[in-house]
Amino acid sequence: MSNEKETKVSALDAKAKALANEEDEDTKIAKLLKNMPKWRFYSLAVLTVIWTVFQLYIKLVKPLDPWFQLPLHMCLALVVVWLYNPMVEKSKSHNKLWWIYDIFLIASSCFICWFFLSHAEQLNYRIFNVDVMTTTEVIVAVLLVINVMEAVRRVVSMSLFWVICFFLAYAWFGQYIPGLFRFSGISFPKLMEVLMYGENGIFGSPLVTSLGTLFYFLVFGTFFSNCGGGGVLIDGGMKLSDKTVGGPAKAAVISSGLLGMVSGSAIANVSTTGVLTIPLMKKTGYDPEEAAAVESVASTGGQIMPPIMGAGAFIMAEIIGVQYAQIAAAAVLPAVAYFLAVFILVHMIAKKKGLGKDSGVHYEGKPILPRVYRLLPIIVLVIMIIMGYSLPRSAIYCTIFSIIIAAISPETRMSPRKLLQTLMDGVRQAANIAIPTAACGIMIGIVVNSGVAVKIAKLIGTSGEGSLFIALLIAALGCLLLGMALPTVAAYLIAVTLFASAIQGLGISALVTNMFIFYFGVVAQITPPVCLASFTAAGIAGASAWKTGWKAFSFAITAFIVPFAFVYRPAILLEGTAVEIIIAYCIVIAATYLLACGIAGYLFRPLKMWERIACYIVAFIFILPSSMSDIIGIAGCVLIMAYCFMTGKKNANKAQPV
């Protein structure tokens, strides 16, 4: 191997090195705060402290009245959004009218907050659907809806904004829609009451989860990453796979999986690990589209990887009424299957391309062992969750522990300025999550009160004649369509409202149903035509976004199959006896292996098309819930592997050994 091919990560990109080793204090949030006017910085700093103290008080001291703490949480999020994203900066023309608009939004948010705080006690005695909305209440409700929708437009997406508009239009003009989805409509005062006071409205369970759980975990994740933990996870993934077949691609899988356990954000994972792994993959011999697809698929898996999954998983626990630890435990096997499939896939692609163990492209980072203690906060968090500690308290204590751990080394020790910046970053992320959870309340309130969910359940039952597979297929397609336009949290919440009752009506448990819907909401991030994680990775790789999207879709095929598998085999989600769970584990691993080999087109040797199809067929047979299908699947798996191994001996010189 020539010296020219020897590559060091330190020469790849200064930003990538900073992300891996946390040597660069001038982070994105630091730059953002540095460039904003001082009055906005100080205002945000004060709001950050107030919001943090409030959140600590309600968990460590005593909870407040729900009509006090929920609106306060919502309004603090709104004001934070207005200050971080002023319209005067977003617009091309710096018209003073935009300042007036921003001031109006801040003032109206404060007015909404004042209304609820001053009427919190009386609202506890208000009878929903009986007491008439006063003029003041209608005005407050209108302002609340306007603020939430404008916040969605600024920090979430225009897609979600237009979806909300569609639901509002349906609420008002439902009586003019022909067919099954026609209903009498909701009067304007009634609609405002539903959205502001209804248990399925803006202050419903999604926002309750944002207040009671998500805020604390988002702040913890920010501190854990900025205190050195994130860098250790990335470096660990890179080191574990260095000097192996397809090492950089495996590094992307491992690093993104490890980082995803903390962040739970596909795009954030791509942006963080992709700047390291994608250039390395390209230099090793992977095509730009392959490199980008591997990174986007691996990063998307972070939302389904315990212990800290996507925000939707916390909301799922709230909806089902179970401990989050149960959700996380149930998600382990599907997550392992997902990452195992991607890991095997990149290995087989490397073998097919003839890439050896020593490609000359190596990662040179700091030693891992001297820094491994920085992972203690995440280890302690997992232990506390398993031991039954409440999620908020666990996150609070582990956040404090992260700061203490960071103080051990001068490299990660947090100055007061960096401490404030990190806290402000965590609060900013909390605000950006609170907004879509509140927005989902608008849509859920309309769906529930218009009877759409019942009608969809009836439609599924009629069209599929009670067929579970048809119901699952319709729900999966609906989730994918929603997930293409909406964030995972919003897609999951709407899909659960629309499809869950129909699936559960066919005898499927709440946990399995919700996990099925959640999975498809997640993989929509890498499903064309709208696949934001894939597009982000394609931008880093300089690859075709369209080709990357389809490549990622094919690489992640396991994620589209596993949800059907755990519906028919609930033992995959730990719903069954010990024997059933062990069998499910073995079956899933075997099916995952065959799927990965079929997609890569390699099993001991390059596969012909009919051999790849045989791998797919046997993998699908494994999903069927019967002893006969297990026997046929195992026999088929053994035959395929034996045949490919024996015939592969003739071509042994075409690929290097593992």
Where are these regions (language model features)?
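Membrane-interfacial loop-to-helix junctions in multi-pass transporters
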Residues: 134-139, 200-213, 239-253, 284-290, ...
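Hydrophobic or amphipathic alpha-helical targeting/insertion segments
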Residues: 100-106, 111-113, 121-125, 132-133, ...
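Transmembrane alpha-helix interface/packing and boundary motifs in multi-pass membrane proteins
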Residues: 220-225, 256-265, 297-303, 444, ...
